[in-house]
């Protein structure tokens, strides 16, 4: 109504037709309760045939916006889907390192590491079936893109395979730099404090320019990955948020 705009699209969470949502990619509306209510009112008629459960938008301060909508009758609720965590590469490289000379990163084959990655995730799903709702392994095509940039590695401990780590140059969320595309350790090597060491080794491999960041999105339930990111110095700089306007069902 005020001449603003919002770039949106209908999407389905993990391709599940029962979980449609409106993805707000960009907008002139501010990331405030008033701005989000304006977007919801404007897009609801256009996407009503799909019966979307929620909006999803990237917002800069998740705790602040959640507090701001609490008690606001225009919203049923709001929650974090994925945290955006980032740090400048040159600063992360200067932080105190976790020393573990057993661990190395070795360039690997996309096909072989994709199969290994799928096996790691399969084992995780068997232990925690709920994880399959929000965590999916990077496939051979995705890992091949990382390999093309020299940023696909097998994690080796005592020269034995231990997992997969991959990154990609990707400018997003207002940042230039590299995205952590994958970090998966097999069961034998999880919960041993190796995650931060892998990230520190990865930082040394990045062909980073001044001002480049290492960033990634981490699901709010993925506590080990959140801890690893914080331990190497990355910070929460935003989040992909589920926003449930009044009259919408909400994302389960």
Model-inferred region functions:
Residues 57-64, 215-226, 230, 242-247:
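Conserved beta-strand-loop-alpha-helix junction that forms the acyl-donor binding cleft
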Residues 27-112:
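Acyl-donor-binding surface of acyltransferase catalytic domains
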Residues 94-138:
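Short amphipathic alpha-helix that is part of the acyltransferase structural core
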Residues 14, 247-252:
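Actinobacteria-biased recognition of intrinsically disordered, low-complexity terminal regions
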Residues 1-50, 60, 165-187:
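Conserved donor-binding loop and adjoining core beta-sheet/short helix segment
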Residues 34-44, 185, 191-208, 226-231:
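Conserved acetyl-CoA-binding loop-helix of GNAT-fold acetyltransferases
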Residues 77-89, 235-249:
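Conserved catalytic-core motifs of GNAT/GCN5-like acyltransferases
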Residues 129-183, 187:
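A conserved beta-strand-loop-helix scaffold within acyl/acetyltransferase catalytic domains
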